[in-house]
UniProtKB/Swiss-Prot annotation:
Listed name of the protein: Imidazolonepropionase
EC number: 3.5.2.7
Enzyme class of the recorded protein, top EC level: hydrolase
Keyword set includes Repeat: no
Source organism of the structure: Myxococcus xanthus (strain DK1622)
Binding annotation for 4-imidazolone-5-propanoate: 89, 152, 185, 253, 330
Pfam families, sorted: Amidohydro_1 (PF01979)
SUPFAM superfamilies: Composite domain of metallo-dependent hydrolases, Metallo-dependent hydrolases
Main location: cytoplasm
Gene name for this UniProt entry: hutI
A GO term from the CC aspect: cytoplasm
Length: 421
Protein backbone atom coordinates (compact mmCIF):
# COMPACT_ATOMS: atom_id res chain seq x y z
CA UNK A 1 0.00 0.00 0.00
CA UNK A 2 1.22 3.50 -0.83
CA UNK A 3 1.47 6.11 1.89
CA UNK A 4 -1.95 7.35 3.01
CA UNK A 5 -2.89 11.01 2.70
CA UNK A 6 -5.21 10.83 5.71
CA UNK A 7 -5.84 8.36 8.52
CA UNK A 8 -8.69 8.47 11.06
CA UNK A 9 -7.99 6.45 14.20
CA UNK A 10 -9.26 6.01 17.78
CA UNK A 11 -12.87 5.50 16.67
CA UNK A 12 -15.71 3.86 18.57
CA UNK A 13 -16.80 2.31 15.29
CA UNK A 14 -16.79 2.94 11.57
CA UNK A 15 -20.07 2.58 9.67
CA UNK A 16 -19.14 1.41 6.18
CA UNK A 17 -22.81 1.13 5.08
CA UNK A 18 -22.12 -1.77 2.74
CA UNK A 19 -25.53 -3.42 2.97
CA UNK A 20 -28.78 -3.15 1.03
CA UNK A 21 -32.02 -1.29 1.71
CA UNK A 22 -33.73 -4.67 1.50
CA UNK A 23 -32.09 -5.91 4.70
CA UNK A 24 -32.46 -4.78 8.28
CA UNK A 25 -31.00 -1.27 8.46
CA UNK A 26 -28.94 -2.01 11.56
CA UNK A 27 -27.17 -4.72 9.56
CA UNK A 28 -26.93 -2.62 6.38
CA UNK A 29 -24.85 -0.02 8.24
CA UNK A 30 -22.15 -2.71 8.74
CA UNK A 31 -20.42 -1.29 11.82
CA UNK A 32 -16.69 -2.00 12.27
CA UNK A 33 -15.88 -1.50 15.99
CA UNK A 34 -12.61 0.33 16.59
CA UNK A 35 -11.63 0.38 12.92
CA UNK A 36 -9.41 2.99 11.29
CA UNK A 37 -10.03 4.61 7.91
CA UNK A 38 -7.31 5.48 5.43
CA UNK A 39 -7.71 7.74 2.40
CA UNK A 40 -5.37 8.17 -0.55
CA UNK A 41 -5.84 10.34 -3.65
CA UNK A 42 -9.40 11.17 -2.68
CA UNK A 43 -10.52 7.54 -2.29
CA UNK A 44 -10.97 5.13 0.59
CA UNK A 45 -7.82 2.99 0.68
CA UNK A 46 -8.22 1.06 3.92
CA UNK A 47 -10.89 0.24 6.51
CA UNK A 48 -10.01 -2.20 9.25
CA UNK A 49 -8.00 -2.74 12.41
CA UNK A 50 -5.08 -0.39 12.94
CA UNK A 51 -2.85 -3.40 13.47
CA UNK A 52 -3.67 -4.52 9.95
CA UNK A 53 -2.22 -1.43 8.27
CA UNK A 54 0.70 -2.40 6.03
CA UNK A 55 4.15 -1.21 7.01
CA UNK A 56 4.80 2.22 5.55
CA UNK A 57 1.13 3.13 5.11
CA UNK A 58 1.53 6.05 7.52
CA UNK A 59 4.31 8.46 6.67
CA UNK A 60 5.44 11.99 7.52
CA UNK A 61 2.92 13.44 5.08
CA UNK A 62 -0.08 11.51 6.42
CA UNK A 63 -2.61 13.69 8.24
CA UNK A 64 -3.75 11.72 11.27
CA UNK A 65 -7.16 12.57 12.72
CA UNK A 66 -7.91 11.44 16.27
CA UNK A 67 -11.61 10.55 16.46
CA UNK A 68 -11.41 10.77 20.27
CA UNK A 69 -13.78 7.83 20.62
CA UNK A 70 -16.38 9.18 18.23
CA UNK A 71 -17.89 7.17 15.42
CA UNK A 72 -17.08 7.65 11.75
CA UNK A 73 -19.46 7.33 8.82
CA UNK A 74 -19.82 8.37 5.19
CA UNK A 75 -20.43 12.00 4.38
CA UNK A 76 -24.14 12.77 4.29
CA UNK A 77 -25.74 13.12 0.87
CA UNK A 78 -28.65 15.56 0.63
CA UNK A 79 -30.89 14.39 -2.24
CA UNK A 80 -33.31 17.34 -2.30
CA UNK A 81 -32.31 21.01 -1.98
CA UNK A 82 -33.12 24.38 -3.51
CA UNK A 83 -29.84 26.01 -2.45
CA UNK A 84 -29.70 28.70 -5.15
CA UNK A 85 -32.19 31.55 -4.81
CA UNK A 86 -32.50 35.23 -3.95
CA UNK A 87 -34.79 36.91 -1.47
CA UNK A 88 -36.33 35.61 1.75
CA UNK A 89 -39.87 34.96 2.93
CA UNK A 90 -39.96 35.46 6.68
CA UNK A 91 -43.18 37.51 6.37
CA UNK A 92 -44.93 34.46 4.89
CA UNK A 93 -43.63 32.36 7.76
CA UNK A 94 -45.32 34.77 10.14
CA UNK A 95 -48.56 34.69 8.10
CA UNK A 96 -48.66 30.90 8.24
CA UNK A 97 -48.23 31.05 11.99
CA UNK A 98 -51.31 33.29 12.05
CA UNK A 99 -53.36 30.72 10.13
CA UNK A 100 -52.73 31.33 6.43
CA UNK A 101 -52.10 28.17 4.41
CA UNK A 102 -49.33 27.57 1.88
CA UNK A 103 -51.87 27.47 -0.95
CA UNK A 104 -53.62 30.65 0.24
CA UNK A 105 -50.32 32.51 0.28
CA UNK A 106 -49.46 31.21 -3.19
CA UNK A 107 -52.83 32.22 -4.64
CA UNK A 108 -52.32 35.74 -3.24
CA UNK A 109 -49.11 36.11 -5.24
CA UNK A 110 -46.70 35.04 -2.54
CA UNK A 111 -44.95 31.73 -2.27
CA UNK A 112 -42.78 30.64 -5.16
CA UNK A 113 -43.77 33.72 -7.18
CA UNK A 114 -42.04 36.09 -4.75
CA UNK A 115 -38.80 34.09 -4.90
CA UNK A 116 -39.05 33.99 -8.69
CA UNK A 117 -39.21 37.78 -8.79
CA UNK A 118 -36.13 38.16 -6.57
CA UNK A 119 -34.17 35.45 -8.39
CA UNK A 120 -34.91 36.91 -11.82
CA UNK A 121 -33.59 40.26 -10.60
CA UNK A 122 -30.35 38.82 -9.20
CA UNK A 123 -27.19 38.33 -11.23
CA UNK A 124 -25.47 34.96 -11.50
CA UNK A 125 -22.68 36.32 -9.29
CA UNK A 126 -25.17 37.41 -6.65
CA UNK A 127 -26.87 34.00 -6.65
CA UNK A 128 -23.49 32.36 -6.08
CA UNK A 129 -22.62 34.80 -3.29
CA UNK A 130 -25.94 34.17 -1.55
CA UNK A 131 -25.66 30.39 -1.84
CA UNK A 132 -22.10 30.03 -0.55
CA UNK A 133 -23.05 30.40 3.16
CA UNK A 134 -25.76 27.76 2.66
CA UNK A 135 -23.17 25.31 1.35
CA UNK A 136 -21.01 26.06 4.38
CA UNK A 137 -23.90 25.31 6.74
CA UNK A 138 -24.56 22.00 4.98
CA UNK A 139 -20.88 21.07 5.23
CA UNK A 140 -20.94 21.85 8.95
CA UNK A 141 -23.78 19.33 9.28
CA UNK A 142 -21.61 16.67 7.67
CA UNK A 143 -23.11 16.89 4.18
CA UNK A 144 -20.47 16.33 1.50
CA UNK A 145 -22.73 15.98 -1.56
CA UNK A 146 -26.02 17.74 -2.35
CA UNK A 147 -28.52 17.76 -5.18
CA UNK A 148 -29.50 21.32 -6.17
CA UNK A 149 -32.61 22.27 -8.11
CA UNK A 150 -33.37 25.30 -10.24
CA UNK A 151 -37.04 26.31 -10.36
CA UNK A 152 -37.07 29.94 -9.23
CA UNK A 153 -36.59 31.30 -12.74
CA UNK A 154 -39.51 29.86 -14.69
CA UNK A 155 -38.16 31.42 -17.86
CA UNK A 156 -35.32 30.43 -20.15
CA UNK A 157 -32.81 33.08 -19.08
CA UNK A 158 -33.21 32.62 -15.34
CA UNK A 159 -33.34 28.83 -15.33
CA UNK A 160 -30.05 28.86 -17.25
CA UNK A 161 -28.68 31.49 -14.88
CA UNK A 162 -29.55 29.38 -11.85
CA UNK A 163 -27.95 26.22 -13.23
CA UNK A 164 -24.85 28.14 -14.30
CA UNK A 165 -24.71 29.48 -10.75
CA UNK A 166 -24.83 25.90 -9.44
CA UNK A 167 -21.95 24.99 -11.74
CA UNK A 168 -19.93 28.02 -10.61
CA UNK A 169 -20.78 27.35 -6.96
CA UNK A 170 -19.36 23.86 -7.29
CA UNK A 171 -15.94 25.31 -8.06
CA UNK A 172 -15.96 27.46 -4.91
CA UNK A 173 -17.02 24.99 -2.22
CA UNK A 174 -15.84 21.53 -1.19
CA UNK A 175 -19.51 20.47 -1.29
CA UNK A 176 -20.16 18.33 -4.37
CA UNK A 177 -23.26 19.55 -6.20
CA UNK A 178 -25.59 17.52 -8.43
CA UNK A 179 -27.78 19.79 -10.63
CA UNK A 180 -31.47 19.26 -11.37
CA UNK A 181 -33.64 21.29 -13.76
CA UNK A 182 -36.97 22.19 -12.15
CA UNK A 183 -38.44 24.58 -14.71
CA UNK A 184 -41.84 22.98 -13.97
CA UNK A 185 -41.96 24.20 -10.37
CA UNK A 186 -44.95 26.48 -10.92
CA UNK A 187 -46.69 28.21 -13.81
CA UNK A 188 -45.27 31.77 -13.83
CA UNK A 189 -47.51 34.81 -13.52
CA UNK A 190 -47.07 35.86 -17.15
CA UNK A 191 -48.46 32.49 -18.28
CA UNK A 192 -51.52 32.54 -16.07
CA UNK A 193 -54.35 31.30 -18.28
CA UNK A 194 -51.78 30.10 -20.84
CA UNK A 195 -50.31 27.08 -19.08
CA UNK A 196 -50.03 25.03 -22.27
CA UNK A 197 -47.75 27.71 -23.69
CA UNK A 198 -45.52 27.39 -20.63
CA UNK A 199 -45.40 23.61 -20.86
CA UNK A 200 -44.32 23.99 -24.49
CA UNK A 201 -41.68 26.54 -23.45
CA UNK A 202 -40.25 23.98 -21.01
CA UNK A 203 -40.23 21.22 -23.63
CA UNK A 204 -39.20 23.16 -26.72
CA UNK A 205 -36.82 25.80 -25.34
CA UNK A 206 -35.67 25.38 -21.73
CA UNK A 207 -34.93 21.65 -21.78
CA UNK A 208 -32.94 21.74 -25.05
CA UNK A 209 -30.94 24.80 -23.93
CA UNK A 210 -30.04 23.16 -20.62
CA UNK A 211 -29.06 19.95 -22.42
CA UNK A 212 -26.83 21.83 -24.88
CA UNK A 213 -24.79 23.26 -22.01
CA UNK A 214 -24.85 20.04 -19.98
CA UNK A 215 -26.19 21.93 -16.98
CA UNK A 216 -28.45 19.29 -15.39
CA UNK A 217 -28.25 15.60 -14.60
CA UNK A 218 -31.92 15.34 -13.61
CA UNK A 219 -35.26 16.89 -14.55
CA UNK A 220 -37.92 17.43 -11.89
CA UNK A 221 -41.60 18.45 -11.95
CA UNK A 222 -43.84 19.57 -9.09
CA UNK A 223 -46.91 17.41 -9.73
CA UNK A 224 -49.85 18.86 -7.83
CA UNK A 225 -53.31 20.36 -8.30
CA UNK A 226 -51.78 23.81 -7.81
CA UNK A 227 -48.79 23.16 -10.09
CA UNK A 228 -48.59 20.64 -12.98
CA UNK A 229 -50.93 17.83 -13.93
CA UNK A 230 -49.87 14.23 -14.38
CA UNK A 231 -50.18 14.57 -18.16
CA UNK A 232 -48.13 17.78 -18.26
CA UNK A 233 -45.47 16.20 -16.06
CA UNK A 234 -45.35 13.11 -18.26
CA UNK A 235 -44.68 15.25 -21.33
CA UNK A 236 -41.99 17.37 -19.66
CA UNK A 237 -40.19 14.47 -17.99
CA UNK A 238 -40.30 12.35 -21.14
CA UNK A 239 -38.78 15.21 -23.10
CA UNK A 240 -36.10 15.59 -20.45
CA UNK A 241 -35.29 11.89 -20.53
CA UNK A 242 -34.91 12.04 -24.32
CA UNK A 243 -32.25 14.71 -23.72
CA UNK A 244 -30.42 12.64 -21.11
CA UNK A 245 -31.98 14.01 -17.90
CA UNK A 246 -33.28 11.39 -15.47
CA UNK A 247 -36.78 12.09 -14.04
CA UNK A 248 -37.43 13.07 -10.42
CA UNK A 249 -40.84 14.14 -9.11
CA UNK A 250 -42.31 16.22 -6.32
CA UNK A 251 -45.07 13.67 -5.70
CA UNK A 252 -48.27 13.48 -3.65
CA UNK A 253 -47.24 16.21 -1.22
CA UNK A 254 -50.46 18.16 -0.79
CA UNK A 255 -53.07 15.95 -2.45
CA UNK A 256 -53.43 12.47 -3.91
CA UNK A 257 -52.85 13.25 -7.58
CA UNK A 258 -51.37 10.14 -9.21
CA UNK A 259 -47.80 11.43 -9.11
CA UNK A 260 -46.42 8.28 -7.48
CA UNK A 261 -47.94 6.13 -10.19
CA UNK A 262 -46.44 8.45 -12.80
CA UNK A 263 -43.00 8.16 -11.19
CA UNK A 264 -43.33 4.40 -11.43
CA UNK A 265 -44.55 4.54 -15.02
CA UNK A 266 -41.56 6.66 -16.06
CA UNK A 267 -39.02 4.69 -14.04
CA UNK A 268 -38.06 7.88 -12.23
CA UNK A 269 -35.07 8.01 -9.92
CA UNK A 270 -37.17 9.39 -7.08
CA UNK A 271 -40.58 10.38 -5.84
CA UNK A 272 -40.12 13.12 -3.23
CA UNK A 273 -42.39 14.23 -0.35
CA UNK A 274 -45.11 11.51 -0.46
CA UNK A 275 -47.11 12.87 2.47
CA UNK A 276 -50.35 11.79 0.74
CA UNK A 277 -49.13 8.61 -0.95
CA UNK A 278 -51.61 5.73 -1.19
CA UNK A 279 -50.97 2.01 -0.81
CA UNK A 280 -51.46 1.66 -4.57
CA UNK A 281 -48.88 4.37 -5.14
CA UNK A 282 -46.42 2.67 -2.83
CA UNK A 283 -46.84 -0.65 -4.60
CA UNK A 284 -46.24 1.00 -7.97
CA UNK A 285 -43.10 2.73 -6.67
CA UNK A 286 -41.75 -0.46 -5.13
CA UNK A 287 -42.40 -2.49 -8.28
CA UNK A 288 -40.53 0.14 -10.34
CA UNK A 289 -37.63 0.43 -7.84
CA UNK A 290 -38.17 4.18 -7.37
CA UNK A 291 -36.48 5.75 -4.34
CA UNK A 292 -38.71 7.58 -1.86
CA UNK A 293 -37.17 10.87 -0.71
CA UNK A 294 -38.51 12.06 2.64
CA UNK A 295 -38.22 15.74 3.54
CA UNK A 296 -39.84 16.03 6.99
CA UNK A 297 -38.40 19.47 7.70
CA UNK A 298 -40.81 20.97 5.16
CA UNK A 299 -43.79 19.21 6.75
CA UNK A 300 -42.77 20.70 10.09
CA UNK A 301 -42.08 24.13 8.61
CA UNK A 302 -45.49 24.28 6.91
CA UNK A 303 -47.23 22.98 10.06
CA UNK A 304 -48.88 20.30 7.95
CA UNK A 305 -50.20 16.85 8.67
CA UNK A 306 -49.68 14.08 7.90
CA UNK A 307 -45.96 13.47 7.62
CA UNK A 308 -44.94 11.05 4.90
CA UNK A 309 -45.61 7.49 6.12
CA UNK A 310 -42.00 6.44 6.36
CA UNK A 311 -42.77 3.19 8.16
CA UNK A 312 -45.20 2.10 5.44
CA UNK A 313 -42.79 3.24 2.73
CA UNK A 314 -39.88 1.31 4.21
CA UNK A 315 -42.01 -1.78 4.84
CA UNK A 316 -43.22 -1.67 1.23
CA UNK A 317 -39.62 -2.39 0.19
CA UNK A 318 -38.60 1.03 -1.15
CA UNK A 319 -35.16 2.51 -0.82
CA UNK A 320 -35.63 5.55 1.43
CA UNK A 321 -33.56 8.72 1.13
CA UNK A 322 -33.67 11.67 3.51
CA UNK A 323 -33.16 15.33 2.59
CA UNK A 324 -33.49 18.80 4.05
CA UNK A 325 -35.41 20.41 1.16
CA UNK A 326 -33.68 23.65 2.15
CA UNK A 327 -35.56 26.46 0.37
CA UNK A 328 -36.86 29.93 1.23
CA UNK A 329 -40.55 29.09 1.44
CA UNK A 330 -41.23 25.69 2.95
CA UNK A 331 -38.01 24.59 4.70
CA UNK A 332 -35.55 27.37 5.50
CA UNK A 333 -33.12 25.02 7.20
CA UNK A 334 -29.87 23.31 6.26
CA UNK A 335 -30.14 21.15 9.38
CA UNK A 336 -29.60 17.51 8.44
CA UNK A 337 -29.53 16.58 12.12
CA UNK A 338 -33.06 17.95 12.50
CA UNK A 339 -34.18 15.95 9.45
CA UNK A 340 -32.76 12.80 11.05
CA UNK A 341 -34.67 13.44 14.25
CA UNK A 342 -37.94 14.18 12.47
CA UNK A 343 -37.55 11.07 10.31
CA UNK A 344 -37.62 9.05 13.52
CA UNK A 345 -40.17 11.07 15.49
CA UNK A 346 -42.65 11.80 12.69
CA UNK A 347 -41.93 9.53 9.70
CA UNK A 348 -41.63 6.44 11.87
CA UNK A 349 -38.12 5.33 10.90
CA UNK A 350 -35.57 3.78 13.22
CA UNK A 351 -32.29 5.60 13.83
CA UNK A 352 -30.52 3.17 11.50
CA UNK A 353 -33.11 3.64 8.74
CA UNK A 354 -32.83 7.43 9.00
CA UNK A 355 -29.03 7.24 8.90
CA UNK A 356 -29.18 4.96 5.85
CA UNK A 357 -31.51 7.48 4.18
CA UNK A 358 -29.07 10.34 4.70
CA UNK A 359 -26.09 8.35 3.39
CA UNK A 360 -26.32 5.35 1.09
CA UNK A 361 -30.04 5.69 0.38
CA UNK A 362 -29.57 9.27 -0.78
CA UNK A 363 -26.49 8.42 -2.83
CA UNK A 364 -28.40 5.66 -4.62
CA UNK A 365 -31.17 8.12 -5.45
CA UNK A 366 -28.61 10.27 -7.28
CA UNK A 367 -26.96 7.36 -9.06
CA UNK A 368 -23.73 7.90 -7.10
CA UNK A 369 -22.41 4.38 -6.70
CA UNK A 370 -19.25 5.36 -4.80
CA UNK A 371 -20.85 7.76 -2.34
CA UNK A 372 -22.67 7.20 0.92
CA UNK A 373 -20.51 4.26 2.01
CA UNK A 374 -16.91 3.62 3.05
CA UNK A 375 -15.43 0.69 1.16
CA UNK A 376 -12.08 0.57 -0.60
CA UNK A 377 -12.29 2.57 -3.82
CA UNK A 378 -15.25 4.69 -2.71
CA UNK A 379 -15.15 8.47 -2.50
CA UNK A 380 -13.06 9.68 0.42
CA UNK A 381 -16.01 11.51 1.96
CA UNK A 382 -16.45 10.90 5.67
CA UNK A 383 -17.49 12.48 8.94
CA UNK A 384 -15.92 12.10 12.37
CA UNK A 385 -18.68 12.62 14.93
CA UNK A 386 -18.25 13.73 18.52
CA UNK A 387 -20.61 10.99 19.75
CA UNK A 388 -19.91 7.27 19.95
CA UNK A 389 -23.06 6.04 18.17
CA UNK A 390 -25.21 7.08 15.21
CA UNK A 391 -28.24 6.63 17.48
CA UNK A 392 -27.29 9.83 19.28
CA UNK A 393 -27.82 11.96 16.15
CA UNK A 394 -31.64 11.83 15.93
CA UNK A 395 -31.89 11.68 19.73
CA UNK A 396 -29.97 14.96 20.27
CA UNK A 397 -32.47 16.84 18.15
CA UNK A 398 -31.02 19.31 15.68
CA UNK A 399 -27.39 19.05 16.86
CA UNK A 400 -24.96 17.99 14.16
CA UNK A 401 -22.00 16.59 16.15
CA UNK A 402 -19.90 16.64 12.96
CA UNK A 403 -16.47 17.34 14.45
CA UNK A 404 -14.40 16.72 11.31
CA UNK A 405 -15.80 16.61 7.77
CA UNK A 406 -13.63 15.17 5.00
CA UNK A 407 -14.40 15.62 1.30
CA UNK A 408 -12.36 13.69 -1.28
CA UNK A 409 -9.68 13.06 1.32
CA UNK A 410 -9.29 16.69 2.39
CA UNK A 411 -10.54 18.18 5.63
CA UNK A 412 -13.35 20.59 4.73
CA UNK A 413 -14.60 21.34 8.25
CA UNK A 414 -12.97 21.02 11.66
CA UNK A 415 -15.09 22.10 14.64
CA UNK A 416 -14.22 22.21 18.32
CA UNK A 417 -16.55 19.86 20.19
CA UNK A 418 -16.26 18.19 23.57
CA UNK A 419 -18.50 15.22 24.23
CA UNK A 420 -22.02 14.86 22.96
CA UNK A 421 -24.40 15.32 25.88
Amino acid sequence: MDVLDLLVRNTSEVLTVEGSHRERAEDALTPRPGAVVGVREGRIAYVGPEAGLPTGAVGPGTEVVDAQGGFVGPGFVDPHTHLVFAGERSAEFDLRNQGATYLEIAKAGGGIASTVQATRAASEEELVRLALPRTKRLLEQGVTTAEVKSGYGLDLATELKMLRAVRRLGTLTPLELVPTLLCAHAVPEEYRGKREDYVRLCIEEILPAVAREGLARFCDVFVEDSAFTVDEARRILSAGRALGMVPRLHADQLTVCGASELAAELGAATADHLEQVTDAGLKALADANVTAVLVPTSTLFLRMRPYAPGRRIRDAGLNVALGTNVNPGSAMSENTALALGLACLENGLTAAEAYWGATRGAAMSLGLQQHGRLTVGDAGDLVVFSCASYRHLPYHLGVAHARVVVKAGRIAVRQQMEGCA
